[in-house]
Amino acid sequence: MAMTVHCDIVSAERQLFSGLVEIVVASGVEGDLGIMPGHAPLLTRLKPGPVRVKKQNGEEEVFYVSGGFLEVQPKLVTVLADTAERAENMDAAEAERAKARAKEALEGKSSEMDYSRAAATLIEAVAQLRAIQQLKNKR
């Protein structure tokens, strides 16, 4: 039986996952992280993108987080997300449309505020698509 660590993935709205996992993979601001049992304590900010967990039965689940924090304690890994969603519940077509709208808004550059908002929307749409793609790749 593989070693495991307890993992909780929560957003402001709800808890999305709680259980024993063999590994948690997430995108931190300093790069990608793979957290396994026995990992050193850590606190880092998360970039928008996928968070992947491999459960003790070998099954993988993929979540999208819009950012937040990842905390590693000796027996617990916690993902505190600004917003989060199971990748299987996400709509790839809607994410593609949001990406296209954001690119179009960036090309218009009507004001600095609009540009910043469009850039943030583009980053989020691309991150959502990465989460959906990871889900497809695991199947």
UniProtKB/Swiss-Prot annotation:
InterPro entries membership: ATP_F1_dsu/esu_C_sf, ATP_synth_F1_dsu/esu, ATP_synth_F1_dsu/esu_N, ATP_synth_F1_esu_C, ATPsynth_dsu/esu_N
SUPFAM superfamilies: Epsilon subunit of F1F0-ATP synthase C-terminal domain, Epsilon subunit of F1F0-ATP synthase N-terminal domain
Gene3D superfamilies (UniProt xref): ATP synthase delta/epsilon subunit, C-terminal domain (1.20.5.440), F0F1 ATP synthase delta/epsilon subunit, N-terminal (2.60.15.10)
Major localization class: membrane
Record-level Gene Ontology MF annotations: ATP binding; proton-transporting ATP synthase activity, rotational mechanism
Disulfide bonds: none
A Pfam family this chain is assigned to: ATP-synt_DE
An annotated GO cellular component: proton-transporting ATP synthase complex
CDD domains on file: F1-ATPase_delta
Membrane topology (UniProt): Peripheral membrane protein
Subcellular location per the Swiss-Prot or TrEMBL entry: Cell inner membrane
Similarity comment: Belongs to the ATPase epsilon chain family.
Assembly: F-type ATPases have 2 components, CF(1) - the catalytic core - and CF(0) - the membrane proton channel. CF(1) has five subunits: alpha(3), beta(3), gamma(1), delta(1), epsilon(1). CF(0) has three main subunits: a, b and c.
Name listed for the protein in its UniProt record: ATP synthase epsilon chain
Source lineage: Bacteria, Pseudomonadati, Pseudomonadota, Gammaproteobacteria, Oceanospirillales
Gene this protein is translated from: atpC
